[in-house]
């Protein structure tokens, strides 16, 4: 029995050591994973191009319309009524008629400046869209990392139980063959060993899938990794829900996008109002042989007369869009405040539950496990009593882990709802 106990604890220590060594090569803290994510995530790289495209659109909006040149009244032959003119080039052009016109459109009512202002708001929108994508991806990545941490800790938990029961099963098999224990006792231990092994395999399969999910956020640096941070007793949040609501309204990129959309609608309305004023077209033309003057140079202006179309329909559309944006802002604010209200209640409830828990209970369970294993090896406990304790031990360990992880998940949700990291 004493040899069995020594062997069991050596295996437990060796298992823990091997587990640690296996993970050393790819150990990363969550903060390090985020740094890799920020530098190598392809979705973020692609979104940055939208900001550069918006810069190019601002440049385009600043440009004047090109002048128009037209050449007309060019005769390819002469008839009997043709008059003779001085040659254009050498002896060519004595009977050549020609008209050339150069026209430039001048936009009135500050249309060009108003379009530039709209494109600047589009650029701001592209920047906010990048921030919103970053906010969503960071939340997704952190959630995936937390789930991976849970699976890692469950793997350690079940791995230790597998080691215990495999050692016990081997010992009971030998003792059963020698007639020292019943076959039923041996089979009970063996079945528990198989059950824990199956559960461990399920957890490991889930962990591999979750590692792949985390790696997918890291671009070309995505690989199998082990998160070195552990899930201990979480630090409880400071601040009130009213403070969180104010922070969210100041920081949320999607809320800023809604506000920016209102500004864009206002800028579009100004453009539509400016369209009521017709543009001015200034022209200069040269006419050779087509007028009473042999070489005629003249100036001209042209503009539409706003008698029927004063852009009334488009102005109305822009006004309605502006009103719609106001309603969307109000609704978005209500949604943000409601989400924080409910999440705050869940956080408060779970925080109270965690505070009532004995801070040393986790360690006491581990000490109790060692004691129960030793007592069982020394035949002071029955199999039923031992397995009943093991089941209670696992249930409590998983419950503690899940409650702590749930609080951390709620903290990540609050960070997501506020739009910035909180202590």
Task: Label each PLM-derived region with a short phrase.
Residues 2-9:
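Sec-dependent signal peptide recognition
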Residues 21-23, 34, 401-423:
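Acidic, low-complexity, intrinsically disordered peripheral segments
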Residues 28, 133-249, 343-346, 350, ...:
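Periplasmic alpha-helical coiled-coil/stalk elements that build and connect Gram-negative outer-membrane
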Residues 35-45, 52-67, 92, 100-117, ...:
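A glycine-/polar-enriched beta->alpha junction
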């Amino acid at each position: 029995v004493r040899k069995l106990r020594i062997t069991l604890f050596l295996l437990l220590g060796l298992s823990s050591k091997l587990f640690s060594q296996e993970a050393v090569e790819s150990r990363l803290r969550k903060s390090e994973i985020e740094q890799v994510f920020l530098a190598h995530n392809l979705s973020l790289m692609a979104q940055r191009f939208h900001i550069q495209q918006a810069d190019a659109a601002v440049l385009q909006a600043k440009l004047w319309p090109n002048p128009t040149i037209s050449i007309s009244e060019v005769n390819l032959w002469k008839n009997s009524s043709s008059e003779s003119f001085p040659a254009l080039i050498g002896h060519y052009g004595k009977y050549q008629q020609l008209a050339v016109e150069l026209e430039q459109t001048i936009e009135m009512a500050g249309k060009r400046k108003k379009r530039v202002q709209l494109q600047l708001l589009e650029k701001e929108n592209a920047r906010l869209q990048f921030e919103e994508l970053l906010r969503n991806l960071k939340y997704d990545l952190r959630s995936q990392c937390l789930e991976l941490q849970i699976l890692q800790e469950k793997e350690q938990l079940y791995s230790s139980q597998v080691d215990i029961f495999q050692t016990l099963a081997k010992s009971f098999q030998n003792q059963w063959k020698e007639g020292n224990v019943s076959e039923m006792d041996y089979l009970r231990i063996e079945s528990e060993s198989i059950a824990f092994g199956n559960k461990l395999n399920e957890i490991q399969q889930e962990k591999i899938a979750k590692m792949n999910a985390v790696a997918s956020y890291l671009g070309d640096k995505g690989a199998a990794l082990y998160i070195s941070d552990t899930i201990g007793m979480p630090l409880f949040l400071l601040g009130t829900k009213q403070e969180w609501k104010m922070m969210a309204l100041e920081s949320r990129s999607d809320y800023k996008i809604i506000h920016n959309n209102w500004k864009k609608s206002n800028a579009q309305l100004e453009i539509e109002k400016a369209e009521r004023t017709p543009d001015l077209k200034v022209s200069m033309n040269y006419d050779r042989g087509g007028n009473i003057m042999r070489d005629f140079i003249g100036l001209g202006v042209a503009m539409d007369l706003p008698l029927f179309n004063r852009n009334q329909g488009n102005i109305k559309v822009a006004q309605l869009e502006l009103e719609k944006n106001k309603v969307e802002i109000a609704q978005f604010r209500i949604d943000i405040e409601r989400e924080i209200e409910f999440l705050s209640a869940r956080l408060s409830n779970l925080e109270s539950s965690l505070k009532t828990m004995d801070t040393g209970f986790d360690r006491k369970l581990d000490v109790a496990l060692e004691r129960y294993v030793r007592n069982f090896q020394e035949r002071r406990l029955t199999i039923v009593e031992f397995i009943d304790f093991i089941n209670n031990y696992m249930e409590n360990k998983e419950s503690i882990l899940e409650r702590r992880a749930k609080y951390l998940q709620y903290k990540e949700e609050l960070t997501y709802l506020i739009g910035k990291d909180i202590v």
